[in-house]
Design a protein with these regions (language model features):
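Bacterial N-terminal signal peptides
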Residues: 8-16
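Sec/Tat signal peptide C-region and signal peptidase I cleavage site
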Residues: 16-24
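Short strand-edge motifs at loop-to-beta-strand transitions and within beta-strands
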Residues: 72-76, 128-130, 139-141
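Acidic, glycine-anchored loop motifs typical of Ca2+
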Residues: 94-102
Length: 147
């Protein structure tokens, strides 16, 4: 009987500890995007938890934010997220149409940037080059828009 009570207590303590750890490992990720070429439009920031859709399909992002521009920079904050591996992709929607405009070859006509300032060789950068570890503590990224 004592053994069962001790086992139940140990299990309850482990579950409570795991729940507390999970709650503690959530934090806000803020992204500051600078070097925009104008104050026109808005900045779209997408947070990806995997390579699915990265960086061209924001509908597959874990979170998508539209952020205003002031003094040729913008700041986006993502809702609290769990510790883990993520990548961020941002673009300057200069004309405010809610999408990244491209030329007839599929090359962006508006500014883009991804975390780690990763570059692709013949196309968009891969998730593996842009990914970073998020500890769960509030933190920030500073990105410079490229055109």
């Amino acid at each position: 009987m004592k053994r069962r009570a001790l086992l139940a207590f140990g299990l309850a303590a482990a579950l409570l500890s795991a729940a507390a750890t999970a709650e503690q490992s959530k934090g806000v990720l803020s992204v500051k995007v600078s070097q925009l070429r104008s104050n026109d439009g808005q900045v779209g920031c997408a947070l990806y938890a995997s390579d699915a859709g990265f960086p061209t399909d924001p509908s597959k992002a874990a979170q998508m934010k539209w952020c205003p521009i002031k003094d040729k920079s913008s700041k986006c904050s993502f809702d609290p997220i769990l510790a883990g591996t993520y990548a961020v992709a941002c673009f300057h929607d200069e004309n405010g149409n809610g999408k990244l405009d491209k030329n007839f070859l599929g090359i962006p006509k508006e500014g883009t940037v991804v975390s780690n300032h990763a570059k692709g060789s013949m196309g968009p950068p891969p998730f593996d080059k842009a990914r970073f570890s998020f500890s769960g503590a509030d933190s920030s990224l500073d990105l410079r828009m490229g055109y």
